[in-house]
Amino acid sequence: MRQSKIALVTGGSRGLGKNMALAIAKKGLDVVLTYNSQKSEADEVVKEIEALGQKAVALQLNVADSTGFEGFFKAVGAALSETFSTDKFDYLVNNAGIGIHKAFAETTTDEFDTLVNIQFKGPFFLSQLALPLLADGGGIINISTGLARFSTPGYAAYASMKGAMETLTKYQAKELGAKGIRVNIVAPGAIETDFGGGMVRDNEQVNNFLASQTALGRVGLPDDIGGVVAFLCTDDARWITAQRIEASGGMFL
């Protein structure tokens, strides 16, 4: 019998995904994390997780290309057997994504299709193909955005994909509940990362404005999100499913 539960975190080599992976490891879980192109960054996260006393593996995954998902899960199955001595993992965190800031009237079909593939089609079919390896009683954690609740010009396409993920979350929870699989979605507000070119982190004017519009008086930090996701990967969250959990500090109330 394996000692630790296992979480698979997409986009776990940097930004919020890295923080999620480390926060999950601090809860005593082992981690499979994915990266798109930055293998060296992913390997460093693996080392940090191992330093916490947990096992970790980094695998390449392009979430935009669903034709590669079947091969990816063959690699996951091999890693589960070789590194973790099991054939199942417990939690899937659909974190990988990009942001495109473009006015509705100027968004191109190529930009729209890119967002669909990465932010909706990818997580939809990745979750579907994960099911044979996802243990009963486990969970799926999807990632949304505060922009699905409030509107900021330039994010029509991005926020629409996240709105679709919020609807999908409820259907997944309904259809997978018979297996004890919980499905929730976490919606971060403005966070200081390199997302969107680091605008929230590096632009003092933007940072100050967003802080002034937040009940808790500041913008978010990666630690504010990683801990929420990690909590959902524990038995303490066993009675929580089909929920949208916004972690924004109370933006635009």
Where are the regions a protein language model picked out?
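Active-site helix of classical SDR
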Residues: S127, M161, T169
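Conserved glycine-rich Rossmann-like NAD(P)H-binding loop of the short-chain dehydrogenase/reductase
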Residues: L29-E44
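Active-site loop-to-helix junction immediately N-terminal to the catalytic Tyr of the SDR YXXXK motif
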Residues: T107, L147, S151-A159, Y171, ...
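Alpha-helical segment proximal to the catalytic Tyr-Lys
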Residues: P132, K174-A178, R238
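Conserved glycine-rich cofactor-binding loop
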Residues: S13-G15
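Short C-terminal tail/terminal secondary-structure segment
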Residues: F150, A230, T241-L253
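Substrate-binding pocket helix/loop in short-chain dehydrogenase/reductase
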Residues: F89, A103-F104, T108-V116, L210
